[in-house]
Amino acid sequence: MEQEQDTPWTQLTEHINIQKKGNGQQTQRLGRPNLTQLMDHYLRIMSQADMHKQTVSWKQWLSLKNPTQGFLKTRALKRWKSFNKQGWTD
């Protein structure tokens, strides 16, 4: 049977289980989360990151995709003015 090697990942994910003996003293036992717990944790973190990314993208999309002609006209004029101020820099 293979013995688990200490890697930065397993060292970081070690957690301490504290158990009380009959005489009231506490003992510490180092334990590692099993693979299922690690995968659950990883999937939870990645899901949260993905939700945040989707929310940011959706907000950006909403800010850019305003269908009114007035908005598009104003935006085009701003870009044109900005372009004229910069001139040909190539």
Curated annotation (Swiss-Prot):
| Principal cellular location given in the protein's record | host cell
> Could you tell me which species this protein originates from?
Influenza A virus (strain A/Beijing/39/1975 H3N2)
Organism superkingdom: Viruses
Q: Which residue ranges run through the membrane?
A: none
Lipid biosynthesis as UniProt keyword: no
Q: Which family does it belong to?
A: Belongs to the influenza viruses PB1-F2 family.
Q: What does it do?
A: Plays an important role in promoting lung pathology in both primary viral infection and secondary bacterial infection. Promotes alteration of mitochondrial morphology, dissipation of mitochondrial membrane potential, and cell death. Alternatively, inhibits the production of interferon in the infected cell at the level of host mitochondrial antiviral signaling MAVS. Its level of expression differs greatly depending on which cell type is infected, in a manner that is independent of the levels of expression of other viral proteins. Monocytic cells are more affected than epithelial cells.
Task: List where in the cell it is found.
Answer: Host mitochondrion inner membrane; Host nucleus; Host cytoplasm, Host cytosol
Tell me which Pfam families the record gives.
PB1-F2
Instruction: State what protein this is by name.
Output: Protein PB1-F2
Gene (UniProt): PB1
- Tell me one GO biological process term: symbiont-mediated perturbation of host apoptosis
Q: Which InterPro entries match?
A: Flu_proapoptotic_PB1-F2
User: Which stretches does the entry tag as region Disordered?
Assistant: 1-31
List the lineage, top down.
Viruses, Riboviria, Orthornavirae, Negarnaviricota, Polyploviricotina
Any extra detail in the entry? Is not encoded in all strains, and seems to be dispensable for replication.
One GO CC term of this entry?
membrane
Give the span(s) annotated as Mitochondrial targeting sequence.
65-87
Keyword line: Apoptosis, Host cytoplasm, Host membrane, Host mitochondrion, Host mitochondrion inner membrane, Host nucleus, Host-virus interaction, Inhibition of host innate immune response by virus, Inhibition of host MAVS by virus, Inhibition of host RLR pathway by virus, Membrane, Modulation of host cell apoptosis by virus, Viral immunoevasion
The answer to whether the entry has keyword Membrane is yes
Q: Where is this site: Low pathogenicity?
A: 66
The record's subunit annotation is: Oligomer. Interacts with human SLC25A6/ANT3 and VDAC1. Interacts with host MAVS.
